[in-house]
Amino acid sequence: MKKSMISCLCFVLLLHFLLVSKVAAEVFCESCLQVRVERPLVVRGGSHEPGLDTKFYVIKLSENLFRGYSSGGGDAYAITGPEAWSMGWPANKVLSKGAAGSYSECGVWINSPVKIGDVYVAAVHQEQKCDYINGGQTHKSMGVSFSYDGLSWVNPITVLTSPEAPKMGTQSGEGDCSLVRAPDEGYLYMYCFRPGRWDNIVARAPEASYMFPSSWRKLYKGNWSEPAVGGMADSLGTIGSSVGYWRAGRKVIALDLDPWFGGIKLSLSSDYKNFFTLKDPLVPFVKNDWDRNLIGKSTDLIAYVGVVNLLGGGNRVDNSGWGITYTYIPHGGTLKEKYLVFQGVNMKVVSEPQQASVGLALTRWEHRSGKYRVTTLPVVRQSEYTERNRIAYLLTRPVVGIETLEVEECVNRQDPDDYLVTDAGGCDGSGHDRIATIGWVYKYPQKNTVPIYRCYSPLGENHFLSSNAGCDDLGSLDMV
């Protein structure tokens, strides 16, 4: 059987950040931004999961008590747990879809609850005129709701609609919005998706009057001049409508799922209007197809990305202690096999420009059979695995002007617990099926990098990766 390999001369990013230097706020060095994305943790899901049909946001109620929000079948659910990432408890319905003919006749989705005083305020995505099997037909709009305990929510008040009428056989309207609270400004900003142009827009309202539709104004021709209900709006481009606020950098964070960009795209803005996009994806992927006949067959699927403060809840974050959430369908899965994933993020400005801004954690897991799996992907059968250690950080895209190698993961056709990491094309002819690209490595040594080696475990009878030639005393170098 042909064995593929990764040369021990490939190099990946160091585990440790460079020393921080103070950068003047008025001169932000975009290429000095350094982001480390940690291993993905599967916290909920499996066959016939009823929810996970929206961005997953979390609020903190008290010490050791958090509440997250999911949706499915047109209704919104709350899930309570002791930590932001501990979301395995039963889901409770907290908001139901509206009556026939209403803006929410097809469903409601609670997005991005934020705390204002003693009240939790949430954007509520609404849909009407739906016929999903007819080209995904639906018409989107947005409401706002509030709650004192995160369980009892008032019926949403519609505050944002499109000037266009519903269309047959396609998505229309404006929706899928997320809220962000501006520090020291007294405004709530709502970033939304406009399917007719496949772009994003923004509206805002004073915190003191967010429940009044007339208070919400869309950005149009550079000013907050248009009514959010039925008004026109400027295009922000395709930055995404999943947002948060980075307090250390005083910038809005926007996330988008963009296969043409190469994965989860991160954009930042200091004025709520003009965004720049980080050149590297946070998590790489090249396909994101919702075709029910293709899901799980040719690749995995990432959907509904969100921003969560893992320590305090909400979506206002610091350099560390926050993460992204998303719904995940693994390679070989179906639309009913959805998993909720939390993935920690550390982000800061360093003293010099970076060749690559993002590093993605490569982690070794041990199966109860003794076999190792080394991956950057979510491990969905997590109860069968023990997390062992982070090996290094991989690149999330090729670096221009420097030789890199694409790294892919594959699984043995005869043994679903036997995984192989190889360079691109190495799965072919090896008796394995390709799962996905899990990152890139430098072909030759670079500053602040470490080598990785392919090793063989006689106990598990499979290959794994290590950052040292001693293979962490778990096996021997594989020189094939």
Model-identified regions with their sequence ranges:
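Bacterial N-terminal signal peptides that target proteins for export
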Residues: 1-10
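Conserved positions at the start
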Residues: 55, 108-110, 174-176, 238-240, ...
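Bacterial N-terminal signal peptides
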Residues: 9-18
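Extracellular glycan-binding segments that recognize GlcNAc-based cell-wall polysaccharides
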Residues: 354-480
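Beta-rich carbohydrate-recognition and catalytic domains
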Residues: 26-106, 115-169, 182-240, 245-297, ...
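Boundary at the C-terminal end of the N-terminal hydrophobic targeting segment
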Residues: 21-25
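A short, acidic, amphipathic alpha-helical segment used as a generic capping/interface helix at domain edges
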Residues: 301-313
